[in-house]
Amino acid sequence: MSSALLLAPGDLIEKAKRELEQRSITPLLREKGSTEAKSKLKEDGEKKNKSEKEENKIHDDRRVESQKSEGGGPADCQRGAGSRGANCATSTGGGDGSAGARTGIGGGGVGRVDSRSGGRGGQGAASDGKGVGKSKTGADRVANDDATRNVGSSEVSPGGITSGGLQGRGGLVAKSGECGGESLDRIGGCSGNSKTEGEEAKAGGGDRRIGGLATQEIADFVKKKIGVEVQVFSKGMSNLFTVDKSLLKRGGLGREDILHQSDIVKEIRASDKKVKIIPLSTVKRMIAEFGGTEEDEIKAVQTQSSSIRYISNRMEDVSRAKAMFTAPTGDEGWKEVAKAATQRPNIMAYVHEGEGDGLKELLHLIDHI
């Protein structure tokens, strides 16, 4: 029997890998260093340029805002001292408790970060550490109870504290409603994560079902039966799969292998009661748990007399291909390969234009060439 080569789209070869392995057919796939890689490189470059432009725009916007705040606010802030209710970052006159955007706590209203005269009895809460003055009411405290309760608000509270308030000398720590009532850090961000460990574990997929078989010998037996490789149980898994004794005996496993499985089950039940023991009494039950195909079907596939031994989507294999199978595909380089193949006079070409991806038709062709 000659070792023939079949051409087919790359994505179809990927889908058929398990069936090709059963038929002892070697896939020869084109390396992703040609069309796909160039396309991806171009796409990555465009994304990078877009990201850099957006980042530069953000920096420019921040610089403009910074210059505005340093150079003074509206005209009424620069002209007048003591204008009632002016929304200024700095003030040369006292004013009567005007509300500033960058403020601490002042007398009767909000004091200034850069206050030079402090208002009428205003209390400077800025980081320059100026002394505490007297408020209108004569109180020496930093804020009243209403101010403390409303510190998370974005509006000026009755006591005169805004959500942008800094920590004063009295040790008042602001809490923001946006952070779920958690303390703010020095730059105004939330100080911690509000998720619990259990919620994070669930978000990371910690509840997913994970399990294995008792021994490597049993794992080999299962692979032979259904053609699927199953891992051996290890610490941290949530399920232990046990194979029925009669199945193991019929599969050629000895008494020691069967007893070894029983011992492992006893040990796990004693050491970790959270592990679930799942019995597998039939081959169909194995297939339901792990997928795969029954042993008789595997043998039937492996003994089919196909001359195909290689399947490829590479241009360099066109000259030695016996046949070509083509179908609608996402393989970007396949169009050129198929075009080159059809120019050969002695190649057999098969085209799938019906419903589905063409996998079933490809395998049918392989089995009958």
Swiss-Prot record:
GO terms for MF: structural molecule activity
Database matches in Pfam families: Orbi_VP6 (PF01516)
Ranges of compositional bias, category Basic and acidic residues: 29-68, 137-148, 196-208
Composition bias type Gly residues, residue spans: 92-111
Primary localisation category: virion
Keywords linked to the UniProt accession: Capsid protein, Inner capsid protein, Virion
Listed GO CC annotations: viral inner capsid
Subcellular localization(s) per the UniProt record: Virion
Disordered, as annotated region: 17-169, 184-208
Family: Belongs to the orbivirus VP6 family.
Protein known as: Protein VP6
Organism: African horse sickness virus
Gene name in the database record: Segment-9
